[in-house]
Amino acid sequence: MRFTQKFSIRWVSVCLLMAAVRISAQEINISHCLNSCPDVSRPTNEVSLHHVFAAAVIPETGEVEWVAYRILPESIGIASLLPRWWEADRLLRGGQRDAALEQTPGFVQPDISNAQDREYRTGEIRMAAEDRGRLTPMTSFAATPYWPELNQLSNMSGLPQSMRTGPWSGLDQAINELTAVVAPLYVVAGPVMSHQSKGRSSESDRADAFYKVVSDGQRVAAFLFDANLPPHAHFCAQVSTLAEIEGQVSLALFPDAELDDDAELVAALGCS
C-alpha cells in the first residue's frame, strides 16, 4: 500500500510526442528519467509513459527505440510466477496493429512446434518466439501493482534468447541488488540497429547489439551486448562507455545530465 500511495500520485500514463515538453515556460519532468528522457531519432516517434517505464516507439514499424525506468528498493520483487503475455500499447496513437500475439495471460509458454506459430508480428516487425524479451525487467517492478504494464509491446524487443537469459539477465540482477545500497537507479536500455536497417521494416532486420546504461544521478555505468553473445558470457565483459553507446545509436540518453563513466559504479555492480 505504501508503494501504491507513493507512486500513483507521481506517475501518470499518457502518450506524448516528446518526453519533456514546455507549457507556459514550465518543463514537465518524467520521473522515469534522470532530469529528462532520452532523445528520439525523429519527431514523429512516440513516447509512451506508463507507471513503471517510458518507451520511445517508431510508429511506422513498431520498433522500440529505447525504454527508461527508475528502480527503487521497494519496487523489486520475485517475478518467477508472474504470468507473461504480450498486448498492444493502447497509449500509442498509431496503435500496434497486426500483432498476432498471445493475448491470454498464462504461466506456460505457447506451443511453437508448428512452424507457422514460431513468428510473431509487431506492426511490421517479425521475430521468433524465443527471441523476444522485455527491455524493462519484471523483477525490478514485481513488488508493484503495475507489473502487468511490462507485458506491453512497447517493452518488447528482439532480444536473442541466449544473450537475454545469460549476460543481460545477469546485469538486471546486479542492478536490482545494487538498489539496496544505492537508490534510486535510472536505467536506459534499447537496441543498436545497423545503419542499413534503421527505419526499415524488413523481416530480416535485427539489432546488432543491445545496450543498458545505469546511473545513480552522478555516475554512469554502460554495457553493450553483442546480439550473438552465448548464454555463458558475463555482463562484466560487456562494459562500454556512455559516449560509445550514444555514438552508435546517435541519441543523447541523458541529455540534461552531466555524467561520468565511473569504474566504482561498475565495481559496485560486481565487476572487479
Which residue stretches match the model-derived regions?
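N-terminal signal peptide c-region/cleavage motif recognized by signal peptidases
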Residues: A20-V21
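Short linear interaction motif-like sites in intrinsically disordered regions of transcription factors
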Residues: V12, V67, W86-E87, P148, ...
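Short beta-strand-initiation
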Residues: S8, H50-V52, D208-F210
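Domain-level detector of nuclease and nuclease-like folds
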Residues: P105-S272
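Short, His- and charge-rich active-site/binding loops that engage polyanionic ligands
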Residues: H51-A129
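N-terminal module-boundary/linker segments of secreted carbohydrate-active enzymes
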Residues: S24-E65, R70-P73, D260-C271
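Bacterial N-terminal signal peptides that target proteins for export
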Residues: R2-V12
